[in-house]
Swiss-Prot record:
Native source species: Prochlorococcus marinus (strain MIT 9211)
Protein name: Photosystem II reaction center protein J
SUPFAM superfamilies tied to this protein: Photosystem II reaction center protein J, PsbJ
UniProt biased composition (Basic and acidic residues): 1-17
Gene3D superfamilies given in the database record: 6.10.250.2070
NCBIfam families xref list: PRK02565.1
GN (gene name): psbJ
Superkingdom classification of source: Bacteria
Membrane topology, from the record: Single-pass membrane protein
Length: 64
């Protein structure tokens, strides 16, 4: 087991000398999806759902 890991296997927030264990640049980006990708996928999903509603309003039961 690594010296940096605690007894439960987690990496501590700070090193013994007080410095952060993970740099702030990597803390918020490592292992995450970019926000622009999440927003793009969400926007496409919203447009798709609205398209289904508009399609349904012109066809089917409510089309007059």
């Amino acid at each position: 087991m690594s010296k940096l890991r605690g007894p439960d296997g987690r990496i501590p927030d700070r090193l013994p000398d007080g410095r952060p264990a993970v740099s702030w640049e990597r803390r918020w980006t490592e292992g995450t999806l970019p926000l622009w990708l999440v927003a793009t996928a969400g926007g496409i999903a919203v447009i798709f759902v609205l398209g289904i509603f508009f399609y349904g309003s012109y066809t089917g039961v409510g089309s007059a």
